[in-house]
Amino acid sequence: MKGLLSLSVLPVLAYASPMIVDSIHQDAAPILSSTNAKDIPDSYIVVFKKGVSSSSALAHQTWVQEIHTSTESKRLKKRNQFTFKNEAFDGLKHTFDIAGGLLGYSGHFDEEVIEQVRRHPDVEYIERDSEVRALESVTENGAPWGLARISHRKRLNFGTFNKYIYAAQGGEGVDAYVIDTGTNIEHVDFEGRASWGKTIPENDDDIDGNGHGTHCSGTIAGKKYGVAKKAHVHAVKVLRTSGSGTMSDVVKGVQWAAESHLKQVGETKKGNRKGFKGSVANMSLGGGKSVTLDRVVDQAVAVGMHFAVAAGNDNADACNYSPAASQNSITVGASTLTDERAYFSNYGKCTDIFAPGLNIQSTWIGSKYAVNTISGTSMASPHICGLLAYFLSLQPASDSAFAVAEITPAEMKENMISIASKNALTDIPADTPNLLAWNGGGSDNYKEIVGGKDNATKEHISSTLTEKLEQLAEEGLTAIYNELKDVVVA
């Protein structure tokens, strides 16, 4: 029965909108459900209040497993007596500790157990576990124009549509965690710079059987298809071959990535890893609104990870989806070759920036040479993740003689937004930032890029000369044009 909420619950619901509280009792933690996701029956994510220690959390988790075992034993006896009592519950599934900033667990419990859990004084709220999916994509014929677009201020033309201008060291020293369906780590485009990190779904294989994660990885760090061509990809599999999974598995995957990042930071401080420049992560997935997933992503950002997430493909307000609504990640909408908002792209104040997302060619599964061309904000977000890795690689390494204060995710997000091409897109709603990602036009000087010296002079000269060469081609001087065009535009 729904009723009035205590004041202590109000901050959670303000953060949670659009979520519903489907079960309210006095002195009990609320149970939250998303308004636009499919719940997984009898599956829950339990989040502890701030201030609960790791030892207290462990004691609670031991307690909940004990009462689960007890109720299951009683259930088994009833099932032996009454054949219609055939439900079985699995108990504790995952435990969560995101660098001490968010503690909790997930599991499959009956109503008797969950009622005891929600009355425990350490519990802040309970969220129904729900389905998460790789954002739907459309397979079409096309060309990899996205890299070219983020390296030019002006709309692409005949001379620039396939010219990616970039710093050669882009991505070097940066780890990229692709939290998705996995990655075809044997693909030649990764040049050995991809490794399997972790498989979260129980009893699943360490392969990408879907292709979605491999495509995202290629856009981030592939030799031919990638923004940051020297970054190292870590596959974090949270979705099964079908492209779907559970919210609790995704949360656990984010935790694993954050822990791996912190381990690399520690190894660098010990002198065991040279040239480390930081970690980025991409999540081209989504489901309904989840307070927990948004908070977990924000906590991973708080420990130093740079996160890009897809806005979603429902042509709707991105604030109604997770992780698109997370506050500290960079939420990415999709643009087209003609500089329009892609017809499917979500929008709204939770969208931070746009990047190419229609007809994007990248790596695929099936062989180490496979490629595919698909569309979606899933394809836009990896452009930003790659750009985060690209910009991080332009910083001095923390173990070098030229080391400077580490650039924080908040600073990087602010800088990326500040240098983006403004008002470049059409069909952008009034409450949505009209910003298109830009990589600095080939400059390898990050300070120069963010300082406003946006390499405009170089690009202006290149663009002007390209136009002149195109005129030569039109006048029949094709041989001269073919000889000079690559030199001028590169």
Curated annotation (Swiss-Prot):
The answer to whether the entry has keyword Secreted is yes
Q: Which residues are glycosylated?
A: N282, N455
Q: What InterPro entries is this protein classified in? A: PCSK9_ProteinaseK-like (IPR034193), Peptidase_S8/S53_dom (IPR000209), Peptidase_S8/S53_dom_sf (IPR036852), Peptidase_S8_His-AS (IPR022398), Peptidase_S8_Ser-AS (IPR023828), Peptidase_S8_subtilisin-like (IPR050131), Peptidase_S8_subtilisin-rel (IPR015500), S8pro/Inhibitor_I9 (IPR010259)
Looking at the record's lineage, which domain of life comes first? Eukaryota
What broad class of enzyme is this? hydrolase
**What intrachain disulfides are recorded?**
none
Tell me the compartments it is located in.
Secreted
What processes does the entry annotate via GO biological process terms?
Answer: pexophagy; protein catabolic process in the vacuole; proteolysis; sporulation resulting in formation of a cellular spore
Thylakoid: present as a keyword of the record? no
Its EC number is 3.4.21.-
Which residues of the precursor form the propeptide?
27-134
Catalytic center at which residues?
D180, H212, S378
Give the Pfam families listed for this entry. Inhibitor_I9, Peptidase_S8
Q: Gene Ontology terms, cellular component aspect? A: extracellular region; vacuole
Give start and end of each Inhibitor I9 domain.
43-133
Leader sequence segment: 1-26
GO function terms (MF aspect): serine-type endopeptidase activity
Per UniProt, residues of the Peptidase S8 domain are 144-450
Task: Identify its protein family.
Answer: Belongs to the peptidase S8 family.
What is this protein's function? Secreted subtilisin-like serine protease with keratinolytic activity that contributes to pathogenicity.
Name of this chain's protein? Subtilisin-like protease 8
Identify the species of origin: Arthroderma otae (strain ATCC MYA-4605 / CBS 113480)
What is the gene called?
SUB8
